[in-house]
Each structure stands twice: as C-alpha cells, then as structure tokens.
C-alpha cells in the first residue's frame, strides 16, 4: 500500500505496550470501542491497515501513533461473547491530525537527521548490541531485519528494532522514544537503555557466582559445567558413529548450531534432545544371526504344543533367511483368537535367531504421528513408536512384533495403516523417515512380524504386504498338555510355590477347561491355574503361621492334592461356572437347530430358533442379524417353498415365520448359517425335532447345493467344547477337515454333505424320512 501524506484509517486504542516500526505486537481486544472498530471495519473484508493509538494515564490520546499492518485477526466465542485478538506489524510513525472513532486521520512522520551528525561511538555500541540480540533471538525474521538495517545503514530502523527487544522500560519511556523523530537522539536513547539492560544482566550473573549463596553454588556446580560437558560428550558419541554422508552433514550441521546457541534459548533444548536421540539410535549396532534349524525346531517344540503347520512355515522362513543371509521378503502375520500363542511364537523366533525381541502394541492407535512421530516444530514433539522402540532396543536388526495391527483406526489425524506401508515395504524401508528424526534410518535389517485377531479388518494395501498364517484354537487334549507342561509351572514360579508342594491332577485340569472356560486359547485357563496357586499359597501361609520358626511345614501332608472337587470349591466363588447352552436347550423342540459360527474369539455354537403362527407368509427376524444372514433366511425359505411338494410337506406360505438367534446384543452376519436355517424351517414344517447332539454349518444355494465356508477347525472345536458329537460340514470343505488332528476327528462324527437333503437326513433325530429328490 502506498501511504499518502494524510490518510484515514481505523483506529485501535491501547493503554499498554507500544508498537515500534519494524516490530510486532499481539493486541487482545477488550474494550467495546475497539471491538466496534474490528466488527465494522476489519472483519468484513475492510482495510488490512490500522492505526495503533496510545491512551495516557490522563485518558488523553498521545499525539503520535503507529501505522500497522494486520498480520492475523483471531476471533472466538466464549460465554456467548465474541472476542478478538490482533497480530500487527509496525510500519511507520504517524501524527494524529483528527480523531473521530472508529477512524482517525493521520499524517506520516519522517525521520530527521543527517548521517554526518551521528556519533560513531554510539553507532558502534548500538550495532554491537544489535548483533548480540540477533544471535540470541529465536526469530529468523528479526535477525535478518537487524542485519539488513546494519548493511543499509538504516540506523533509525536499527534503533527501533533494538528498543523493541528491551523489556524493562516504562510505557512512558516507550512513548517518548516513539515520539522522537531525530534519529541521533533515538540512537543515544537506545545506547543508554541497552547499557542499562547489560548491567542488570551482569548483576544477576554476579549474584549467581559461587560463594554468594548456597543455592546458586549448587546450580553452578551442577548445571554450568554439565551444560558444556554434555555438548562435548554428545560430540564424542556422534563422532564415533558411522553415518551416511547425507546424515552426517545434517547431524554435524545441527551440532555446530547447538555450539553457537545460547543455552537459554528454547530451541537449544529442542536441538539438544534431537541430537541425543540421534546419538542413542543403533545406527551400526547389530546382533549376529545364529540360525540353526534344528535348534529353532527344538525351541518351537519346547515352547508350543501342536500348531505343526505354523511351526513348519516358521522354519521355512528361517531357512530362507539363513540361505540368503537376509530377512527381506514377506512379512509374517499370525492371525487367530486371543490367547493361542501368537506373541510367544514371535518371541521363539527371536530366540532361535539369536536376535533381540521388541514388541510395539498398535491397538487403538488413531493418529499417524504415533507411528511416524511429530515434526520438531510442534510443542512437546517426540519420535514415533518405531524409532522410540529402536532406541530402547539398542539393535538395528531385532525381531520386531507389530501387535494387534487389525486394531488400527483411521481418523482426522491420518491413517496409521498407511504409515506402516513404508515401514513394511522392502523397497522403501532402507530410508525410513520419522517426522521427528527427519533423516533417513535403515530399518531393512529388522524382521517384522505382525499379529491380528481379525484379518478382514486389515486395510487392503497393508494386507497385501503380509503373509497371513492362520492359527486355530486348541482342542481339549492340547489344552490339557499346555496346562501340564507350561501353565502350571509358570504360575507356580510366579507365586513362589515349589512344584513339590502341590499336585494338580488331570481331572482337575479338565474340569477347569470344561466348566470354567469358554475360549479358543488358554488365557482364562492360566488365570484359573493362578487362582488355584493362590489357594495353595494361602494354605501354606496358614500352616507357617502356626510355627514360624519351623524348618518344615507342620501338620501338613505334602504335596497338596488338588482334584476335581477342589476345583469346584476354589473357582466357584471366583468365577461363574459356565453353563453350556447346548445342555440348557435340550431337548430340542421342532424348529430349533444348532448352527456354528466363528468370531475373533474362536468358534461358537449358535442356536437357531424358528416358530410359526397363522398369517400371510411374512418373515420376522430378531437377534441383531446382518444383511447377509437375513438373505440366507430368504434363500432357505425359498428352497423350502420350491421343494415342499416333493418333500411331502405343507407349505409355510399360510404362516408367519419368526426366526431368532439368541444373544441379541451380539452382531451376527455371514452366509454359513444357511444349512442351519434350512434345517430349522424343515423341522418346523414337519413338526419333527432335530438331533440334539448335532450341529451344522454351510452356505446354501437356491437350488439346494451346500457351498464351502471358512473356519472349519474353529467350528469343530466349538462343537466339541459344547459336547456335540456330530457335525455336518460341506463336502467342499473336506480338505480343511482332514487337516484337523486325527484325535479330534476320531472323537467327532463328521458328515460331509453335498446337498440340503443330505444335511437334513444327517440332522434328523430318527432314521431319514426323506426320499432323494
């Protein structure tokens, strides 16, 4: 904007703080007069320039004002009142010619003085002080303005900039300086005030030297030497690290900045923290791989029961790593219900390779910055979880477990899943960029392993980078072995009880599994074992209290025998005994069938109930059913309607049908309930109950074909846990069924069906009554 000799501009009146040309000022708007000026002339696309006028203690307006540029205008509402704040930059001195709120007419004031009149000693003192201010300033813009003023010999502007940084002046002194047109006088005032400020700081430092007081002495001993030593130690650590050329240039450039910086500047601490992080990262520190396949096989066998397919895939992965001497390739992702050993498998892999193990929990993360860190410009910025974990690990090639990757959520702060893509891509992760670190760090030597409960919740791009290894739940036999070989010893050690003091028999373990757990894994089972150990610990403590000086436990038969009756006494008070839904619903009435489903917690038996009443053929569904499940009901009813005559059944078109799946608070969806729904409707139409010891799963087509489903092992194990002995599966799932342990297959009566008629025959209580269509 070109300023004329006289102009009219909006006016803001302040009674504290003086804006000098070249300086900046934040002005909170409190008075109604200033608020009106803003609302009438500044908030509606008005002028970007304003006059800052100054009110004296006599309520008069000082005759000299400042023409300012509005850099930012803030507005917010609090208690139904709109508040404003201005960020302004001083441009020129101005004389107030006429004041008529909310505007005033001003004329620009020019500096008066010839350079020849300046006192060279005064100029040198001001320039010297100005350079110190520029060096200590946190504002690059201010430092640049100082140097430009010195280069251009603009001493009036230089004096204004220097005085704007002096904090201990009175309001009236600032106004006197603002009203002084003569540059030489302003330089003298500036020199005088800067000298006063230096003397004040010197006095403060003198008070802090050793001997004046105990507290400054401690500060002097602890802080002042350590500040210098800390930088020297930091330089030694950084010099010992072999950086790449790009990283080295950046790190030592920042170290040079730190050395030339005043420790009292706020950026000093930020830069120091950044350099300390760089020095603590494992740039060149690695562990030597010690991959022996036989040793790895033994570690996996000793630490985990069954899971032969998973162990085989892990050994194959380790074999490739040994041959290639590299871990680049597919990233393993173990998926399955909680408590089945996904994390412990990753620990076993680290042990078998001789590498350090580092776990990062990703559950519930919504902010990309949790993965990649915050930029250093933010207050309280910190590195992301990956870099932070590497700092604690002190190795650049650990086995890195990304736990619960399916629990990542996208939000307004970005997508954490997308942030993992660079980390897990072998073509990019040699130059991984954390926002806080802001220099490339090589994470390509890390072996990444992920875990998830529900693989369907993974982002497609992230899922594409992972090799999914499914881990199923455990059978009763496997749980008993795990409990005997691992859980009991672990809990006894945790509770400091000698194995010689207690004997937990197999029937007690089976009772804990059957009656007090309902899970695919063994997490709740371990809690139950812990409860038994606490009961034993109490009995031992009570015996010791009777004779504390005894070398042996008095009046006690050891080991303490824990049988099935003891389990009921110990756990009944602590855990509600599990009631099997199968037992509760027997005997089954017509229209009721046991289906099977899979959740993130493993397989479960899902009762299906159907009832009818006179009506018009309407279908009512309850139980929090999803769209796919509701369509399966329509398919089952459509098949029954099309084949009712051939089956010799009365049509259900004259009845309203109500289909309900219990546990109404739980979402249910998926196509695998099709065969169960068809069986329930046929049973309802015939008035004949289905077998109460059988469960069924499978998708059906409208033409009566039974289609393949997923989660075969989980569903068979769920039926086994509930005491069901017959399971009807689709014929097309035979291959998955044969992968189940032979012991389980021998216990269960599994029928493989091709058509809906095969399913109904297998599910009938008595001999089949249906003829083949």
From Swiss-Prot:
- Name-wise, this protein is Lon protease homolog 2, peroxisomal
Q: What does the sequence similarity comment in the record state about its family?
A: Belongs to the peptidase S16 family.
Keywords tagged on the record: ATP-binding, Hydrolase, Nucleotide-binding, Peroxisome, Protease, Serine protease
Per the record, the gene is lonp-2
Q: Where is the signal peptide?
A: none
Stated EC number for the protein is: 3.4.21.53
SUPFAM superfamilies named among the record's database cross-references: P-loop containing nucleoside triphosphate hydrolases (SSF52540), PUA domain-like (SSF88697), Ribosomal protein S5 domain 2-like (SSF54211)
Q: Does the keyword Nucleotide-binding apply?
A: yes
Q: Which GO terms describe its biological process?
A: protein import into peroxisome matrix; protein processing; protein quality control for misfolded or incompletely synthesized proteins; protein targeting to peroxisome
Task: Report the residue ranges where the short sequence motif Microbody targeting signal is annotated in this entry.
Answer: 771-773
């Amino acid at each position: 904007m070109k300023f004329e000799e006289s102009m009219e501009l909006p006016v803001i009146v302040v009674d504290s703080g003086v804006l000098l040309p070249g300086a900046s000022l934040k002005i909170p708007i409190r008075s109604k007069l200033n608020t009106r000026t803003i609302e009438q002339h500044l908030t509606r696309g008005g002028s970007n320039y304003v006059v800052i006028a100054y009110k004296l203690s006599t309520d008069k307006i000082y005759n000299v004002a400042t023409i300012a540029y509005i850099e930012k205008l803030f507005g917010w509402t609090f208690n139904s009142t709109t508040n404003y704040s201005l960020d302004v930059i001083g441009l020129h001195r101005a004389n107030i010619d006429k004041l008529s709120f909310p505007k005033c007419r001003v004329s620009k004031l020019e500096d008066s003085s010839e350079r020849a009149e300046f006192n060279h000693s005064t100029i040198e003192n001001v320039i010297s002080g100005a350079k110190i201010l520029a060096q200590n300033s946190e504002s690059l813009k201010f430092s640049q303005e100082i140097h430009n003023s010195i280069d251009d010999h603009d001493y009036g502007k230089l004096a204004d900039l220097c005085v704007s940084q002096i904090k201990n002046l009175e309001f009236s002194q600032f106004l006197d300086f603002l009203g002084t047109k003569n540059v030489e006088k302003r330089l003298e005032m500036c020199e005088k005030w800067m000298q006063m400020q230096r003397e004040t700081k010197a006095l403060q430092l003198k008070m802090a030297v050793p001997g004046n007081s105990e507290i400054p002495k401690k500060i002097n001993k602890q802080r002042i030497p350590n500040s210098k030593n800390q930088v020297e130690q930091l330089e030694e650590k950084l010099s010992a690290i072999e950086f790449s050329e790009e990283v080295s240039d950046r790190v030592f450039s920042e170290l040079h900045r730190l050395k030339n910086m005043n420790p009292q500047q706020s950026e000093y601490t930020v830069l120091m923290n950044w350099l300390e992080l760089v020095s603590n990262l494992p740039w060149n520190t690695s562990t030597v791989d010690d991959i022996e396949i036989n040793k790895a096989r033994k570690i996996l066998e000793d630490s985990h029961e069954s899971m032969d397919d998973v162990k085989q895939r892990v050994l194959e992965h380790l074999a490739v790593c040994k041959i290639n001497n590299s871990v680049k390739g597919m990233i393993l992702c173990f998926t399955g219900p909680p408590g089945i050993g996904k994390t412990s498998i990753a620990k076993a892999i680290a042990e078998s390779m001789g590498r350090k193990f580092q776990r990062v929990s990703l559950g519930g993360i919504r902010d990309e910055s949790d993965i990649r860190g915050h930029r250093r410009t933010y207050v309280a910025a910190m590195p992301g979880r990956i870099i932070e974990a590497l700092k604690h690990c002190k190795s650049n090639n650990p086995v890195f477990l990304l736990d619960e990757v399916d629990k990542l959520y996208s939000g307004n702060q970005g997508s954490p899943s997308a942030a993992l893509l660079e980390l897990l891509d072998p073509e990019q992760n040699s130059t991984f960029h954390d926002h806080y670190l802001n220099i490339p760090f090589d994470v390509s030597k890390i072996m990444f392993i992920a875990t998830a409960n529900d693989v369907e919740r993974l982002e497609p791009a992230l899922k594409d980078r992972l090799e999914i290894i499914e881990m199923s739940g455990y059978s009763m036999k496997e749980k008993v072995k795990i409990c005997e070989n691992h859980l009991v010893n672990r809990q006894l050690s945790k509770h400091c009880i000698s194995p010689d003091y207690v004997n937990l028999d197999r029937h007690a373990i089976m009772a804990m599994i059957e009656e007090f757990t309902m899970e695919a894994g063994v997490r709740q089972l371990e809690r139950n074992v812990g409860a038994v150990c606490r009961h034993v610990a109490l009995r031992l403590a009570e015996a010791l209290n009777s004779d504390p000086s005894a070398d042996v436990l008095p009046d006690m038969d050891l080991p303490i025998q824990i049988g099935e009756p003891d389990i009921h006494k110990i756990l009944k008070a602590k855990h509600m005994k599990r009631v099997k839904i199968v037992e509760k619903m027997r005997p089954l009435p017509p229209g009721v069938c046991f289906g099977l489903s899979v959740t993130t917690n493993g397989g479960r038996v899902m009762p299906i109930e159907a009832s009818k009443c006179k009506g018009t053929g309407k279908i009512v569904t309850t139980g929090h059913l999803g769209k796919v499940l509701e369509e399966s009901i329509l398919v089952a009813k459509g098949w029954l309607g099309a084949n009712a005559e051939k089956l010799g059944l009365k049509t259900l078109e004259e009845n309203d049908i109500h289909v309900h799946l219990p546990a109404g608070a739980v979402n249910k969806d998926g196509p695998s309930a099709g065969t169960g729904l068809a069986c329930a409707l046929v049973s309802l139409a015939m008035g004949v109950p289905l077998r109460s010891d059988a469960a069924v799963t499978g998708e059906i087509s409208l033409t009566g074909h039974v289609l393949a489903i997923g989660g075969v092992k989980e569903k068979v194990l769920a039926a086994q846990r509930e005491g069901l002995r017959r399971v009807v599966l689709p014929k097309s799932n035979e291959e998955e069924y044969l992968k189940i342990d032979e012991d389980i297959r021998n216990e269960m009566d599994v029928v493989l069906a091709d058509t809906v008629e095969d399913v109904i025959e297998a599910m009938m209580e008595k001999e089949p009554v249906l003829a083949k269509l």
